[in-house]
Amino acid sequence: VGFKAGVKDYKLTYYTPDYETKDTDILAAFRVTPQPGVPPEEAGAAVAAESSTGTWTTVWTDGLTSLDRYKGRCYHIEPVAGEETQFIAYVAYPLDLFEEGSVTNMFTSIVGNVFGFKALRALRLEDLRIPTAYTKTFQGPPHGIQVERDKLNKYGRPLLGCTIKPKLGLSAKNYGRAVYECLRGGLDFTKDDENVNSQPFMRWRDRFLFCAEAIYKAQAETGEIKGHYLNATAGTCEDMMKRAVFARELGVPIVMHDYLTGGFTANTTLAHYCRDNGLLLHIHRAMHAVIDRQKNHGMHFRVLAKALRMSGGDHIHAGTVVGKLEGEREITLGFVDLLRDDFIEKDRSRGIYFTQDWVSLPGVLPVASGGIHVWHMPALTEIFGDDSVLQFGGGTLGHPWGNAPGAVANRVALEACVQARNEGRDLAREDNEIIREASKWSPELAAACEIWKEIKFEF
């Protein structure tokens, strides 16, 4: 017959330890936990096969193509220290397997069916190396860090934001009032909560109008450029675009999208619109923990972050290192650099499995948000540096005197930390001292210091 039917060992075809990776290959590092009795080579090869050209049996149509050209290859297997049952499998995928400019297609292949594969107990995608040839097919962030600073005329410090709470239930006018007070007090941005879309108590068009009014009023009074992340996420792409278009007509600087619940296709569409129309795009990562929280299954957030930089977004939530949500410092800083920098060296201590060259794709500002308040300011300034957005929701609106004084307290604390850093002081060592000193000159900050001095989220 010319072809040998039957089930075959994956490792005969897909495990190639002597393969030299090409500059154009997409490389993946998987943490594999095979079922008992499945050898690492077979499991690694199975992952490569199922996420590229393979199927469970030999098919005669294999003869109509060149498998060697199109197959994924497991080219290296390394043990995981302290874990008998796990190992890291490195897989190389030829560039031709993927549609240009489609994060959706990339993920459908690499993290598609293979995650339900019976021979594996669990599978986690730890990192991806995106080759420059593939990166160049993406537009990436609509504007990037430098353009954003120029548009907003804000330099030399992190930007300040605040999520408007209570997240659900306010009327549009009261919502706009809260926005105005925060911006008037000294914040750069306020934010729609990720679950604020267009509900019965507040339809999107009303919210957009009142928020725009708040922005213009605050700008006129402070002489600073202000923004509010208007959440354009919707049930259909058409509705999402309608909201983005209305935001542009109002002349506001920034809109927002929930990229995981909204989906990468919708996100890339919105990002293209934002670049063409001068809107900044703030990205919220609702649902990420469903995908990235388990240590042995799913995918690490650094992969979702890389995917977002390709799909497009100017801000993305990236954990705080200090607040109420999870995140280890070195690992977090690893993917924060992957978002901001142009070239990132492989560094396993920070969870970075591959050297990544973004070939001047614009950078994304990491957003620290979730359970942070004025006492965290020195640590945040030190950890995240200037190119970041620090978001205090409850840490602004929870101020005993109201929203505007809460905003004042945060702005004073931030300016004090930036000044101390510029004078060469050690923020890590003198953190509380810097805040205490500043609070002598700012009753708003003093009140904030008093109310949050005991708060800790430690479990």
From Swiss-Prot:
Its EC number is 4.1.1.39. Its cofactor is Mg(2+). The record marks K324 as: Transition state stabilizer. Binds 1 Mg(2+) ion per subunit. Signal peptide: none annotated. It is an enzyme of class 4 (lyase). It is found in: Plastid, Chloroplast. It catalyses: 2 (2R)-3-phosphoglycerate + 2 H(+) = D-ribulose 1,5-bisphosphate + CO2 + H2O; D-ribulose 1,5-bisphosphate + O2 = 2-phosphoglycolate + (2R)-3-phosphoglycerate + 2 H(+). CDD domains: RuBisCO_large_I. The basic functional RuBisCO is composed of a large chain homodimer in a 'head-to-tail' conformation. In form I RuBisCO this homodimer is arranged in a barrel-like tetramer with the small subunits forming a tetrameric 'cap' on each end of the 'barrel'. RuBisCO catalyzes two reactions: the carboxylation of D-ribulose 1,5-bisphosphate, the primary event in carbon dioxide fixation, as well as the oxidative fragmentation of the pentose substrate in the photorespiration process. Both reactions occur simultaneously and in competition at the same active site. Heterohexadecamer of 8 large chains and 8 small chains; disulfide-linked. The disulfide link is formed within the large subunit homodimers. HAMAP family: RuBisCO_L_type1. This is Ribulose bisphosphate carboxylase large chain. The gene is rbcL.
